[in-house]
Each structure stands twice: as C-alpha cells, then as structure tokens.
Amino acid sequence: MTLDVDAQKKDEKLLLSTIQQEYKILAEYKMIESEKVSGIYVIPSYANSLQWFGVFFGRQGFYENSVFRFSILLPDGFPDDKAVPAIIFQHNVVHPLVCPYTNSLDISHAFPEWRCGEDHLWQVLKYIQAIFADPLDSIRSVANIQELSNPEASKLLNTNRDAYAALVQESIVESKSRVYDTPPTEDPHYIVFEKFQANVHGPVLDQIRKSRNTIVPAESGVGGAATGLSWVKVKEGDFKPLSIE
C-alpha cells in the first residue's frame, strides 16, 4: 500500500511539473507574439512542445530573399535547465556559425548558458535575425576562427566576399527549391507552403488589395497587381500571406 501511495505521489508531482513547464513554454510563445519578431515564423509542435517548427525569411545583405526552415529543440528541463535550445536548419545553410555537417546553429556566443527568467526564445530569434543581417559582425568577437562551426565560410567571408556570396546563393536556391516538398512529419503544426491557387488564395489577395487601397489611398493605381505572394498553411483550410517577393 505504501508503495502504491508513493508511486501515486510521484506521478502527481510529475504531472504538476509537466503542466508548469507547458505554461512556461506557452508564455515564451506569447512573448514572441508581443515582441513582433519580423521575418521569422515559429510554432510549437502539436505533438511535443519541446520541438518547434520555424521559417526564416532573409530581407537584406547576403541572405536577401532566402527562405530557411529550421527546428528549435528545447532541453527536457526547459526553461530551468542551463542547457541552451538547439537550432537546426532543415537544409544546408552557409554561415560561419552553422555546422555544414549537422546544420546546427551555434548560439553559445550569445547564450553560453540558459538563464531562466532572463533569457527568452524571442531573444534567440532576434539573434538569428542579427547573424544573417550581418554575418561578419556576428563573428567579430571570435579570436580563433577554428572555434567556429564553419571556419571555411568564415575565411571566405573575410577574404573573398564574392565567393562567399556565391556559396550563400547556392544554399538559398536549394532551400527555396524545396519549400513545397512533402512535409517530413504529419504534425498538424508543421508550417506548410502551397503554391498560389486562384480559387483558394484569390479572395484573400483581394482583401489585402482592398485593405491597402483603404489605408493608403494615394497608392491606388500605382505599380499594378502584386505578385509573388508567399503563403503558409498552419492547419487545414487556414492560409496566411507571409510576404511579397
């Protein structure tokens, strides 16, 4: 009987701990929404809140017009654990801080350890923005380039910008060519892109045009129709426009 009671208490404690962790993770997601981090979209997995799906859209510099999928893997003890989240890109990304073998991003230069209550996931997303906006600045404080995840990329960035830019473009082209690939998971929260379909996306596009005409009347009739909309579907029948290329 005593063993049964102890086991029950242990289960209740584990359940309470799990619920508390879920609330903390939800709070992290809400903070991301309130911070309005632009150019990056993330959502926790439906099946496992410790795994997040994300997409980065480059808007300037070497990585302009890039679309990189990535995952955020939170430690089992997040956010109380000092271990930092893991950021892993789905495909090859050329950057001094991204390992060419594992596609993992080294965030230890900004987050040597996770400080519960001080460090937050929206800050990690801001860091991702920063390292792509200015890759050279992101490694400026590193004295030994051999300590970087991709020292060869670092060397090119410092000595041959054209060659570096060419490699980056190759990775961008490859990544964008696989945007519409079949999802590797059946998780309903996986971010799915779909090609423009007039019967599905047309009404939403019309609403966007009308909204723009209402908000900025001076721009009506200028430049013709918008093209190249990127769309994301986070669940069946729910489409959201992300950007105009």
Curated annotation (Swiss-Prot):
UniProt xrefs under SUPFAM superfamilies: UBC-like
Pfam families attached to this UniProt entry: UQ_con
Domain UBC core: 20-177
Matching PROSITE patterns: UBC_2
Gene3D superfamilies recorded: Ubiquitin Conjugating Enzyme
Transmembrane regions listed in the UniProt entry: none
Family per similarity comment: Belongs to the ubiquitin-conjugating enzyme family. FTS subfamily.
Name of the protein described by the UniProt record: Protein crossbronx
